[in-house]
């Protein structure tokens, strides 16, 4: 799961991983159970990682109906079952009416910043995250 959080000005929220300083990303995560609907996963991960409730007035969650399959980085391989080497990432976005300060879980993320989407794409460590940010103008609800 990848959720790009942005404003109408196409400023994007990035959060820095606590376990990998310098690794900036959008909200990411996985289903809690096999049948969990993707939209529910996106909403839960946003709440867990930023404190933002997607149901707040003015917030717009959108499924891009786009997915990426990529090889799992070795540093995170231990989080997966033995033999699992690839992950399928479903892309969503969440438009906020304005840039807000997230409430980070310090076990997962240590810092946050808002950047224009092109600068944010350059800052992301994940190629699929950077690609999603570059697609933001096509998928954004303005």
Outline where the language-model segments fall.
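NUDIX/MutT-family hydrolases
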Residues: 89-133
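Hydrophobic pocket/interface hotspot
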Residues: 15, 42, 46, 112
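The catalytic Nudix box helix
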Residues: 26-64
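C-terminal alpha-helix
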Residues: 135-142
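Conserved N-terminal beta-strand and adjoining loop/helix that marks the start
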Residues: 1-13, 34
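A conserved beta-turn-beta hairpin within the catalytic core of GNAT-like acetyltransferases
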Residues: 20-23
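Active-site-adjacent beta-strand/loop module that shapes the phosphate/pyrophosphate-binding cleft
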Residues: 65-101, 113
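Active-site beta-strand termini and strand-to-loop segments that position acidic
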Residues: 5-8, 17, 94-96
């Amino acid at each position: 799961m990848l959720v790009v959080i942005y404003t109408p000005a196409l400023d994007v929220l990035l959060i820095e991983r606590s376990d990998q300083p310098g690794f900036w990303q959008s909200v990411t995560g996985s289903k809690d159970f096999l049948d969990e609907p993707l939209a529910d996963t996106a909403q839960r991960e946003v709440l867990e990682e930023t404190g933002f409730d997607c149901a707040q007035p003015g917030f717009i969650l959108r499924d891009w109906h786009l997915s990426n399959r990529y090889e799992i980085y070795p540093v995170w391989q231990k989080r997966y079952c033995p033999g699992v080497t690839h992950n399928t990432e479903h892309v969503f976005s969440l438009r906020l009416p304005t840039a807000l300060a997230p409430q980070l879980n310090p076990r997962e993320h240590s810092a946050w910043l808002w950047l224009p989407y092109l600068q944010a794409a350059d800052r992301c460590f994940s190629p699929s995250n950077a690609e999603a940010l570059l697609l933001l103008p096509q998928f954004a609800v303005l």
